[in-house]
Amino acid sequence: MSKDDLIQFTGTVIELAPNATFRVKLENGHVIIAHTAGRMRKNRIRILLGDKVTVEMTPYDLTKGRVILRHQS
């Protein structure tokens, strides 16, 4: 699967879970589980409760995703 196949959504972090995992409510109302992308871990970008984030998901599993960007507040 190429990067072109990934779908991007914007959402808000509603719950923090262990191991850099978050529950994110998307703008369309769906709630998914997302983990932090490797680049964000490497650069030590912190994600807090209520942060607005961009999540990328595969079309095969729309319940899980990867946080790729934290929007400035």
Curated annotation (Swiss-Prot):
Keywords: Cytoplasm, Initiation factor, Protein biosynthesis, RNA-binding, rRNA-binding
UniProt xrefs under CDD domains: S1_IF1
Entry keyword annotation includes Acyltransferase: no
GO MF annotations, alphabetized: ribosome binding; rRNA binding; translation initiation factor activity
Chain ranges of the S1-like domain: 1-72
InterPro entries found in the cross-reference section: NA-bd_OB-fold (IPR012340), RNA-binding_domain_S1_IF1 (IPR006196), TIF_IF1 (IPR004368)
Domain of life: Bacteria
Predominant location category: cytoplasm
UniProt entry tagged with the keyword Cytoplasm: yes
Compartments in which it is found: Cytoplasm
Matching Pfam families: eIF-1a
Membership in a protein family: Belongs to the IF-1 family.
PANTHER family found in the cross-reference section: TRANSLATION INITIATION FACTOR IF-1, CHLOROPLASTIC (PTHR33370:SF1)
Protein name as catalogued: Translation initiation factor IF-1
Organism: Rickettsia bellii (strain OSU 85-389)
